């Protein structure tokens, strides 16, 4: 199956984008596809060989899943790649300094329609953009 690529432009400096993308406390705030979803737990050891573990689910408790990966490559403010425990790979490219374009390319799973997987990723990126741009307006964060 062909990889899926999605991207979004975020009107925030790269230093803040990088922090918000990678800090577990921030990940819990933006990593969702709608107000019905949440990420109640996030662990992130951002280094080659380090682990990323996100627990995502519906707020009503009707469905949840673990998103677990090991980092392959990390280049600060530029690039992240990881391999999921099931063997699929994902790459995230950060381009520009302000605004920043985030481009995520990932291998889709075999169980869900490609369009659904693309829509899910686009919704997460849109949630990140909204969160990041709101944080930029908060002087204690930026």
Q: At which residue positions do the language-model features occur?
A:
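Glycine-centered tight beta-turn/hairpin loop motif at sheet-sheet or coil-to-beta transitions
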Residues: 1, 62, 85-87
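Hydrophobic ligand-binding cavity/cleft-lining segments
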Residues: 1-37
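Hydrophobic/aromatic beta-strand elements that line small-molecule binding cavities or substrate pockets
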Residues: 6-8, 41-44, 67-72, 89-96
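A short, structured loop/turn motif at beta-sheet edges
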Residues: 13-15, 46-47, 72-77, 93-101
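Hydrophobic pocket/interface hotspot
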Residues: 17-20, 27, 52-54, 71, ...
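Glycine-rich portal/gate segments that line the openings of hydrophobic small-molecule binding cavities
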Residues: 39-83
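Beta-strand/loop substructures that line and gate deep hydrophobic ligand-binding cavities in soluble
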Residues: 79-123, 127-130
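Short, highly charged C-terminal tails/helix-capping segments
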Residues: 131-142
């Amino acid at each position: 199956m062909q990889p899926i690529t999605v991207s979004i432009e975020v009107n925030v400096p790269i230093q803040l984008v990088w922090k918000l993308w990678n800090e577990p406390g921030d990940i819990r705030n933006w990593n969702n596809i709608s107000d019905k979803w949440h990420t109640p737990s996030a662990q992130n050891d951002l280094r080659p060989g380090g682990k990323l573990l996100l627990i995502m689910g519906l707020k009503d408790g009707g469905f949840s899943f673990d998103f677990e990966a090991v980092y392959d490559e990390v280049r600060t403010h530029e690039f992240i790649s990881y391999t999921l425990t099931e063997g699929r790979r994902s790459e995230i490219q950060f381009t520009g300094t302000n605004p920043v374009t985030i481009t995520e390319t990932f291998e889709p799973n075999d169980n869900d329609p490609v369009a659904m997987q693309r829509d899910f990723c686009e919704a997460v990126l849109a949630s990140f953009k909204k969160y990041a741009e709101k944080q930029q307006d908060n002087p204690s964060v930026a």
